[in-house]
Amino acid sequence: MSNRRETRKAAQDFIDNLKPLRRPNSEKIFIEGSRPDIQVGMRQIHQTDTRIVNTRGEETFEANPPIKVYDCAGPYSDPNADINVRRGLPKLREGWILARSDTEELNSASSNFTQQRLADDGLDHLRFDVLPKPRRAKAGKRVTQLHYARQGIITPEMEYIAIRENMARDEVTDEQLNRKKPGEAFGALVSKPITPEFVRDEVARGRAIIPANINHPEAEPMIIGRNFLVKVNANIGNSAVTSSIEEEVEKLVWSTRWGADTVMDLSTGRYIHETREWIVRNSPVPIGTVPIYQALEKVNGIAEDLNWEVFRDTLIEQAEQGVDYFTIHAGVLLRYVPMTAKRVTGIVSRGGSIMAKWCLSHHQENFLYTHFRDICELCAAYDVSLSLGDGMRPGSIADANDEAQFAELETLGELVKIAWEYDVQTIIEGPGHIPMQLIKENMDKQLEHCAEAPFYTLGPQTTDIAPGYDHFTSGIGAAMIAWYGCAMLCYVTPKEHLGLPNKEDVKQGLIAYKIAAHAADVAKGHPGAQIRDNALSKARFEFRWEDQYNLGLDPDTARAYHDETLPQESAKVAHFCSMCGPKFCSMKITQDVRDYAASLENAARSEADSVQTLEVGAAESYSKAESYARAGMDKMSATFKQTGSALYSETHVEAALSTEKEPV
């Protein structure tokens, strides 16, 4: 069997046998809002107790509280969920949408292309099993979350988001877990608990969006804005040469498991329409697309043959399927194209290059720009958010922050204000390839020109020397720009610039970007962001190995790395790892010093006849503790020299494992 067939069969088996995805020592919990139908899912990680031995050798245990973390997997992480990919996910928001009474169900699809696909019996074997009827706003109505927010309405989606963003952090009362370093938020408002009113106000101001198409009721409400947790997008999609519907659905589920807050379907191959239907119906997160890709397929890949009518029909097709946000390259203007002539890498955006070619071939202005108000009117009828694409983004650090890039950014700032006239939620896309010293300028200019609309960047990649490792090179820039105020990061996988990512590539890209997003939340001083760090650090210091794994982003990998050198069960409770061994573990030495100092202080207290005697005894105890610590360090120093002065020596580990008699 060929590799392609094996991959497709594996994906088919994954779908056929899909069960809720479990994490070790975790459970799915739900926090109820102001009404029973607002049930906000989170993941709760249970910890083991801390073992405490007093000076008399008596053992006690101190409980460690469970840690709640943000969960993007929806029903895929709920052990009670009935998962059936052919039926799709439960329609979480359907009741909320119907209760507003401002939409209507259509008897049939409005898109000519959709009607043609449905009439083609040859596609029946690819079609999603249960196709819902599409909905649209009633005549004269706008059904966007921005419209409701401006009317002063707090929707169930907004309340859901407030609960989700807070993650019940007010339940954490442990002083050690609540410690955090002062943050630098660069003007972001991140110091207070999130309330439904705060969510409404941020959306009303255009500083945040809730991507939530009325035809995607399966999606759990989430928010994108710099005053909220930094979000991460994952790209999936088939191409003309590889991948299948089964593989893309598998990658969707896989993406949500590893923390994708949104997913963009960038399919460019056959069966784009059918693939997208499967993805939307099974997605608990918002789905984005670049409609120009499919429009180009409809004109046989000839950019010059594109026109407004084909593109408009594509927007309607995708909006009625449930796509939550469109990337539109309306800022690629005819007069900007010559600005890229002297670039090292020219125009690297697929959408940008398509529209640049169209503009030059017709010597006319970009039809996405001239029809932008029509696009907004259409989006307002379905609550499709706009992601204004950066078609002029730099494709190398040599082209960073040039005239073409910033000219387009100013145009995007003009377009976002037009979108707001139609109550259309809007975010701005950003680069790209930017060296570290130029990253902040990008964020500053975006805030200046785009009226604080959320920024959404691809990286940026900080160096061009590492093909195969661009999830690292871009993760550096992603952490920086998110700290400065970027609201959502588009992940980059190890296959960037090289090929279509597989499952493992998707995981690696997401882990890298979840690290970047979380690091930015901590740096901004986001309330509660550091709780998980503190819990893991405490577990590490107390040698609670299983808790260390489970509190991490990737427990399986952490456990596997530990077990490569210390596979024994006894090593799961040992007070050392394979890096330093039992004799050189800094944390174990620190614990020994603490314990000895405490024992001497207790002895001094018991012998004291007066307060003065107690004070003198305690001082002497600490002095003795220092002497003990010094003696211990001297002994370790001598041993270190005897073993050849190697900083990290496996000799210590092998010696520890060769005998069970030596205490650890």
Curated annotation (Swiss-Prot):
[4Fe-4S] cluster binds at residues 577, 580, 585. It comes from Shewanella amazonensis (strain ATCC BAA-1098 / SB2B). It comes from the Bacteria. Pathway: Cofactor biosynthesis; thiamine diphosphate biosynthesis. NCBIfam families: PRK09284.1, PRK13352.1, thiC. Zn(2+) binds at residues 433, 497. One of its GO terms (cellular component) is cytosol. The keyword Secreted does not apply. Binds 1 [4Fe-4S] cluster per subunit. The cluster is coordinated with 3 cysteines and an exchangeable S-adenosyl-L-methionine. Homodimer. GO terms for biological process: thiamine biosynthetic process; thiamine diphosphate biosynthetic process. This is Phosphomethylpyrimidine synthase. Belongs to the ThiC family. GO terms for molecular function: 4 iron, 4 sulfur cluster binding; carbon-carbon lyase activity; zinc ion binding.
